[in-house]
Each structure stands twice: as structure tokens, then as C-alpha cells.
Amino acid sequence: MPNIKSAIKRTKTNNERRAHNVTIKSAMRTAIKQVEVSVANNDAEQAKAALSSAAKRIDKAVKTGLVHKNAAARYKSRLAKQVNGLSA
């Protein structure tokens, strides 16, 4: 346990930020899974809607620095490839 006042504040802030980051990343992962489930069910309309939502969540995670932009591009590319494979 830190004794210095600023260290106590930093510990509190870090815990709050970690909780926030976990929430954002979890929402991103859930959105990605929704796309994959829609693709598995061969539901093209649902998959396209889920892809749009997932891309939005992924981009927000990049904006806050939770995911590297190249990793995000990879996620979105793979999901788009799966969704486009349904309509072909």
C-alpha cells in the first residue's frame, strides 16, 4: 500500500482506468463474437449489422489506445471477409 499521497491517487486512478478499459475491450470482443455467430448461422443481414457495430467498437478501442491500429485493421478485415463470403 503506497504511503505517499500522489501514489495513493495514482493507484486509485489506475484501478478506475483498468476497470473502464476492461469494459471497453469486453464490449469489443462481444461485438466480434456476434458477427461470428451471425456468420455461422448464415444470416447475412444480421452479420452486416453486427459488422458495422463491431467496427465501431474496434475503432473506439483504437482511439483510446486499447488496441493497436494494425491489430484493429486485421480484426475488421477478417470479419469483413467472413461477412462478404456469405453473400458470395
Curated annotation (Swiss-Prot):
GO terms for molecular function: small ribosomal subunit rRNA binding; structural constituent of ribosome. The gene is rpsT. Keywords: Ribonucleoprotein, Ribosomal protein, RNA-binding, rRNA-binding. Binds directly to 16S ribosomal RNA. GO terms for cellular component: cytosol; small ribosomal subunit. This is Small ribosomal subunit protein bS20. The keyword RNA-binding applies. Belongs to the bacterial ribosomal protein bS20 family. InterPro entries: Ribosomal_bS20, Ribosomal_bS20_sf. One of its GO terms (biological process) is translation. HAMAP family: Ribosomal_bS20. The keyword RNA-binding applies.
